[in-house]
Amino acid sequence: KYDERILHEVTLESIKDYRETGAIPASFEKAGPKESIFFEPAKTKVAIVTCGGICPGLNNVIRALVNQLVYRYGITRILGIRYGYEGLIPKYNHPVIELTAPMVSDIYQSGGTILGTSRGNQDVEQMVNTLEILNINVLFCIGGDGTLRGAHAIYKEIEKRKLRIAVAGIPKTIDNDIDLMQKSFGFETAFSIANDI
């Protein structure tokens, strides 16, 4: 069911507040396979971008994402956006790379991100223009709080234009400072190394 949600805060007090005010509680769409999917896999084109600072596990996430898209959903057109959101801005001239299961098979052995990364705000309209030019149906944004704010801005521009592009955020930060999350990948490793020092 698409209307199943997981509540972020489940306390009697918060439930009472939501009922009294009529507010919609903070929640997540329930993860897992659905009865039907919006995009037809054979025609779907996906892009993956990594932004912000590097942290342990980035290449593992890229690899797992590509493998799931290919082997579970049968999606074979997957692009890697180079150097963060800069890769969606034409003036930087960062070429996209084709991501395949064989290409990402051993990237977990390397640190950082094979896609490169960058920091800083980019022009949202230009980024969405690039997604349209590339015929992207789904954009996965891997990053911290700034990246996720950027992903939300991209989503709002897509919504404004009434485009059929999905945007998904994959939280990553060694700071563990993303709302509604107990732990993000990268934090555990950073904490354990800092603890050893």
What are these regions (language model features)?
Residues 61-65, 146-165:
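Short Gly/Thr/Asp-enriched flexible loops that form oxyanion-binding sites at enzyme active sites
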Residues 155-184, 188-193:
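Short, acidic/small-residue loops that bind anionic groups at enzyme active sites
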Residues 2-39, 86-139, 174, 183-196:
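Glycine-rich oxoanion-binding loops at beta->alpha junctions
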Residues 45-55, 113-116, 137-143, 169:
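Short glycine-rich or small-residue beta-strand-to-loop segments that form or flank ligand, phosphate
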Residues 40-89:
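N-terminal phosphate-binding or glycine-rich loops at protein starts, especially the Walker A/P-loop
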Residues 51-53, 80-86, 119-120, 144-147, ...:
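Short, ordered loop/turn segments at secondary-structure junctions
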Residues 131-147, 155-156, 166, 174:
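Glycine-rich, mobile lid/loop segments that gate access to catalytic sites or pores
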Residues 37-42, 47, 71-73, 105-109, ...:
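Solvent-exposed alpha-helices and their adjacent loops that cap or buttress functional pockets
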